[in-house]
Regions:
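Helicase-core coupling region on the C-terminal RecA-like lobe
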Residues: 1-68, 125-126, 159, 164-191
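Conserved C-terminal motor-coupling region of P-loop helicases
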Residues: 100, 108, 136-148, 179-187
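Short, contiguous acidic/charged loop-to-helix segments that flank catalytic cores in large enzymes
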Residues: 47-56, 74, 108, 122, ...
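Conserved helicase motor "Helicase C" RecA-like lobe of SF1/SF2 P-loop NTPases
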Residues: 67-116
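A short beta-strand element within the Helicase C-terminal
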Residues: 117, 121-137, 154, 162-166
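Conserved SF2 helicase motif VI
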Residues: 143-163
Length: 191
């Protein structure tokens, strides 16, 4: 909550007391960026209605989601009803993720705890754990919808306990907001 508070609200936004110090794993950081720059992932344009998709990034997100579920423990997730949100600014990415989750038998016990939606579809909602797929990966540094920082404010403030962002820093670092967000996350990881 500290970064969005500083960037969007002049430091005046504070987490609610009941979630301020709440975490899932004692040794875990509350926010993590998985940089896909070295992975040679590429976005694809699939049309005006659905926008862009980055299948390799989506597949990595699902792999990281499974790892995180195993770290927390499946029985704990089910007992405590730890819920997960998966957010992307692009409808094509959301649809791809929904289809992959539906087809993955290992995720079946947790499906009722997953919400997969666009940033706009997530407005007003929160989840214990949020994964964000930023999709954009191109040499030109074009970021499209990601230029709309109001949407990014919504996306990065949906997590009650853990936020995981997947994105290509090489593409995003040309924009001040993403550069500062990445620096903030790296500083947390170094503490």
């Amino acid at each position: 909550m500290k970064f969005p508070s500083q960037w969007f609200y002049n430091g005046e936004l504070e987490a609610a007391p009941e979630v301020r110090y709440r975490g899932i794993l004692d040794w875990d950081t509350p926010i993590h960026w998985i940089d896909t720059s070295e992975m040679d992932f590429k976005e694809e344009f699939v049309g005006e209605t659905f926008g862009r998709i980055n299948k390799a990034e989506a597949d990595l997100l699902l792999s990281e989601l499974k790892i995180y579920i195993n770290r927390i423990g499946g029985s704990r997730i089910l007992e405590e009803k730890i819920d997960f949100g998966i957010i992307s600014p692009y409808k094509a990415q959301v649809q791809y993720l929904r289809n992959k989750i539906k087809a993955d038998a290992s995720l079946k016990p947790y499906r009722s705890l997953f919400t997969v939606n666009t940033v706009d579809g997530f407005q007003g909602q929160e989840r214990d754990v949020i994964f964000i797929s930023l999709v954009r990966a191109n040499e030109e540094g074009q970021i499209g919808f990601l230029n709309d920082l109001r949407r990014m404010n919504v996306a990065i403030t949906r997590a009650r306990m853990k936020l995981v962002i997947l994105g290509e820093a090489e593409t995003l670092k040309h924009h001040g907001f993403y550069r500062k967000l990445l620096e903030f996350i790296q500083n947390i990881g170094n503490q």
